[in-house]
Amino acid sequence: MSQRITIDHRSAPALRHPEKAHRPDNPIQRKPSWIRVKAPNHPVYHETRALMRDAGLVTVCEEAACPNIGECWSQRHATMMIMGEICTRACAFCNVTTGLPKHLDEDEPRRVGEAVAKLGLKHVVITSVDRDDLEDGGAMHFARVIHAIRETSPQTTIEILTPDFLRKDGALEVVVAARPDVFNHNIETIPRLYPTIRPGARYYQSVRLLDGVKKLDPSIFTKSGLMLGLGEERMEVAQVMDDFRIADVDFLTLGQYLQPSAKHAAVEKFVTPDEFDGYAAAARSKGFLQVSASPLTRSSYHADSDFAKLQAARNSRLKESL
């Protein structure tokens, strides 16, 4: 007769990544000099942090342990993460907590709109955790956040960084109908590495998502990015670039993968700044409107100034076609 064992989870410390607990440790390598950043200590950084706390908002800057948080928050640039801080996926590279999310906060769109107005942002980036537990993957919540920002800050341009809405019929149409200025969905890595790095996702689903945005509304800028240093080969990155161009992706970002903990995927290589320059040159030759490639490049890094460059590049290309 089997014995039933009851575990009292209330007395156990919460694990940020319980699904990774059984994995062998991957030693964290010392970062090269070109990746190190200063600890945040600017007064505006603390003001931005306090505003996020007071509004009860989550930022991907903190949850994903972004190395650029000091620089960005010192300029009042914070990427807000909606729909909670718990993700239903368990990607091998990501520092966001995995688990069973809470119910959606129906008041969150209003608070995001107010925070954007208080920060006086000209350009805002909104991202989210994956919400596979929701029927629409959180698409309507994204739309409500976009509408709330339009109400409080009609001149602010809006960039969204979305999940893949895998098996969520109609979700993409809902988000695109809300008309963000930039629709970003990150591929993250090359298709060969998906089974180990991004096991809950499908590479071609992500490519189709980006292609679908352009088919629904060609005026919306599309954007996607990869982390380098996970074991990819140069030709594999070039193939992803080609897939992006077939899907008419406008903006490509390339940055160095940094290992959040010993339980996460190991850094296979620190890609040098010169190598990033080479990737950027290759991407520009393929026709992207905008390319950002450097060790510290992240999806929303310098997003405001990059959006201005993106608009200028489109206008220039339109003039050339006349």
UniProtKB/Swiss-Prot annotation:
The keyword S-adenosyl-L-methionine applies. Its EC number is 2.8.1.8. PROSITE patterns: RADICAL_SAM (PS51918). Transmembrane segments: none annotated. InterPro entries: Aldolase_TIM, Elp3/MiaA/NifB-like_rSAM, Lipoyl_synth, rSAM. Pfam families: Radical_SAM. It comes from the Bacteria. Pathway: Protein modification; protein lipoylation via endogenous pathway; protein N(6)-(lipoyl)lysine from octanoyl-[acyl-carrier-protein]: step 2/2. Its cofactor is [4Fe-4S] cluster. It is found in: Cytoplasm. [4Fe-4S] cluster 2 binds at residues 87, 91, 94. Keywords: 4Fe-4S, Cytoplasm, Iron, Iron-sulfur, Metal-binding, S-adenosyl-L-methionine, Transferase. Residues 1-29 are annotated as: Disordered. Residues 73-289 form the Radical SAM core domain. It catalyses: [[Fe-S] cluster scaffold protein carrying a second [4Fe-4S](2+) cluster] + N(6)-octanoyl-L-lysyl-[protein] + 2 oxidized [2Fe-2S]-[ferredoxin] + 2 S-adenosyl-L-methionine + 4 H(+) = [[Fe-S] cluster scaffold protein] + N(6)-[(R)-dihydrolipoyl]-L-lysyl-[protein] + 4 Fe(3+) + 2 hydrogen sulfide + 2 5'-deoxyadenosine + 2 L-methionine + 2 reduced [2Fe-2S]-[ferredoxin]. [4Fe-4S] cluster 1 binds at residues 61, 66, 72, 300. Binds 2 [4Fe-4S] clusters per subunit. One cluster is coordinated with 3 cysteines and an exchangeable S-adenosyl-L-methionine. GO terms for molecular function: 4 iron, 4 sulfur cluster binding; lipoate synthase activity; metal ion binding. Residues 1-25 have a biased composition (Basic and acidic residues). GO terms for cellular component: cytoplasm. Belongs to the radical SAM superfamily. Lipoyl synthase family. This is Lipoyl synthase. It comes from Gluconobacter oxydans (strain 621H) (Gluconobacter suboxydans).
